[in-house]
Amino acid sequence: KDSATTTKDVEVKNYVLKSVAQNKTNELAATIDGATKNIKASEVTIKTPDNVVLPVKSVSVDSKDATKVTLTTFSDMNDGKEYTVTLDGTTVNFVATDNKVASINIDKPTIPVKTETEIKLVAKDANGVILKELPYGTSDVNYDFSLTTANGYVNGSKLYLNKVGDTATAEITYKTNKYTADGKADGNIGPNKLTITATDQATVSSFK
């Protein structure tokens, strides 16, 4: 009885791209199996709907979970269209943000006591994609941002509070600079008043 042995070439992938979601206009959160620490920016291909390749600026692997990989691009992806991400022969699609501001907030509701801490305005779309991070004191035609405290001081973009429990007030507004026929602001968000509180170092949190 003759027996024939068939040899089959099995393609072994170094990485398997499982999913992609957008964090910021120029940042993607990818889930990737494999030795992710070895991924080079040049190995990841991101294409626009018109097949234009967007170069990847950096690849960053989460220190606690190696399947969580952040891909940063030089260009913004904010036209609401479908993009493709390819790595090691696997392609995953995602729809980019439409760049429409749905919410505004500050990045830190609490700051460490007696420590100068930068405060940023954060604007997000309806899906939570960060569209803008604006440090206090940076002028932008679409945003108003005031920061006041009687219990410390503001130095540039940084806030300092004297003791635990002391507060500052941030007031933020998003402006479309568009108006209705009767002259009212159209599509603005705010003004939102938010409180920032000084806490001891161990309990500091940030909005995610």
Residue spans for each PLM region:
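Short, solvent-exposed loop/turn segments enriched in Ser/Thr/Gly
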Residues: 25-28, 112-120, 166-170
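Short, surface-exposed alpha-helix to beta-strand junction/turn motifs within ectodomains of secreted
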Residues: 27-59, 132-149
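Short proline/glycine- and polar residue-rich coil/turn motifs
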Residues: 60-66
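Extracytoplasmic/surface-exposed domains of secreted proteins
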Residues: 1-2, 27-48, 66-92, 168-180, ...
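Short, hydrophobic beta-strand segments
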Residues: 71-76, 155-165
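Beta-strand-connecting loops/turns
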Residues: 56, 80, 114-116, 133, ...
